[in-house]
């Protein structure tokens, strides 16, 4: 059996009905749309219109807001950095946000890159990032490396 030999099971599909092609077809004249009214017209769909009933998007309350000071950070795990170093696309002695983007480890730096602890830390890794989790910093330092965090530290109130 090949992909080009596959076909639907017998009786599982119906032929498409061509409507509005004469009274004898059974779906002529009004073409299954009934008589007059908004639904009989072409271009009927008005997005969000529910026939005069208060639409769902107006019945429900507005919620939340977008914080003006929020940061949209990219993130990278230690395991992903270790793979890139093994593949030879990253130099473990000097890893920066620019080198992570250039090596394809992170697609975009956005408002900075945050280092997370999933995976094993490579030996003697020296990395400079905007943010890092406590577990990631501990893992890198335990493996004999160092982490430099350039971003502002979190406020005590935020933790």
Curated annotation (Swiss-Prot):
For this protein, the record's InterPro entries field holds: Ribosomal_uL15, Ribosomal_uL15/eL18, Ribosomal_uL15/eL18_sf, Ribosomal_uL15_bac-type, Ribosomal_uL15_CS
Which keywords are on file for this protein? Answer: Ribonucleoprotein, Ribosomal protein, RNA-binding, rRNA-binding
Q: Which GO terms describe its cellular component?
A: cytosolic large ribosomal subunit
* Region (Disordered), start-end ranges: 1-39
Origin: domain of life: Bacteria
NCBIfam families (UniProt xref):
rplO_bact (TIGR01071)
Belongs to which family? Answer: Belongs to the universal ribosomal protein uL15 family.
Tell me which PANTHER family the record gives: 50S RIBOSOMAL PROTEIN L15 (PTHR12934), LARGE RIBOSOMAL SUBUNIT PROTEIN UL15M (PTHR12934:SF11)
Q: What is this protein called?
A: Large ribosomal subunit protein uL15
Q: Which organism is it from?
A: Hyphomonas neptunium (strain ATCC 15444)
């Amino acid at each position: 059996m090949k992909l080009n030999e596959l076909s639907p099971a017998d009786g599982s599909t119906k032929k498409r009905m061509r409507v509005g092609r004469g009274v004898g077809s059974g779906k002529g004249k009004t073409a299954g749309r009934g008589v007059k009214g908004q639904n009989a017209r072409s271009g009927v769909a008005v997005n969000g219109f529910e026939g005069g009933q208060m639409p769902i998007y107006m019945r429900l309350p507005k919620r939340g807001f977008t914080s003006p000071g929020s940061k949209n950070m990219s993130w990278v795990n230690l395991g992903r950095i270790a793979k890139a170093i093994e593949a030879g696309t990253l130099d473990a002695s000097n890893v920066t946000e620019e080198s992570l983007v250039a090596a394809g480890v992170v697609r975009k730096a956005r408002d900075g890159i945050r280092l997370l602890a999933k995976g094993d830390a490579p030996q003697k890794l020296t990395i400079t990032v905007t943010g890092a989790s406590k577990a990631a910093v501990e893992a890198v330092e335990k493996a004999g490396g160092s982490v430099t965090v350039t971003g502002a530290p979190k406020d005590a109130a935020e933790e």
